[in-house]
Amino acid sequence: YFSYNDKVIKILEAEYLNTIHHVTAGTVISDKLEIACGSGILQVKKLQQESKKALNVEEFLRGTNILKATILK
């Protein structure tokens, strides 16, 4: 899970990509909600904002604008 705009968002489905990057862990590195991890990239597929229904990443991003280079915690 991560927090964004004071809301908890659960990652329900994701794929790990074993890709080298040079950014801080937690940084959004693409418009498709790919997040840098310690030693790779987490490609988010499905998530759920608190008190909302589960959505695939495309549906979620239509209503929530998480910009590239945002650092998630």
Swiss-Prot record:
Q: Which domain of life is it from?
A: Bacteria
Q: Which InterPro entries match?
A: Formyl_trans_C (IPR005793), Formyl_trans_C_sf (IPR037022), Formyl_transferase-like_C_sf (IPR011034), Met-tRNA-FMT_C (IPR044135)
Reaction catalyzed: L-methionyl-tRNA(fMet) + (6R)-10-formyltetrahydrofolate = N-formyl-L-methionyl-tRNA(fMet) + (6S)-5,6,7,8-tetrahydrofolate + H(+)
Q: Name one GO molecular function term.
A: methionyl-tRNA formyltransferase activity
Q: Which UniProt keywords apply?
A: Protein biosynthesis, Transferase
Enzyme Commission number(s) from the entry:
2.1.2.9
- Function per UniProt: Attaches a formyl group to the free amino group of methionyl-tRNA(fMet). The formyl group appears to play a dual role in the initiator identity of N-formylmethionyl-tRNA by promoting its recognition by IF2 and preventing the misappropriation of this tRNA by the elongation apparatus.
Family that this chain belongs to:
Belongs to the Fmt family.
Annotated protein name in UniProt: Methionyl-tRNA formyltransferase
**Per the UniProt entry, what species is this protein from, by scientific name?**
Rickettsia akari
Question: Corresponding gene?
Answer: fmt
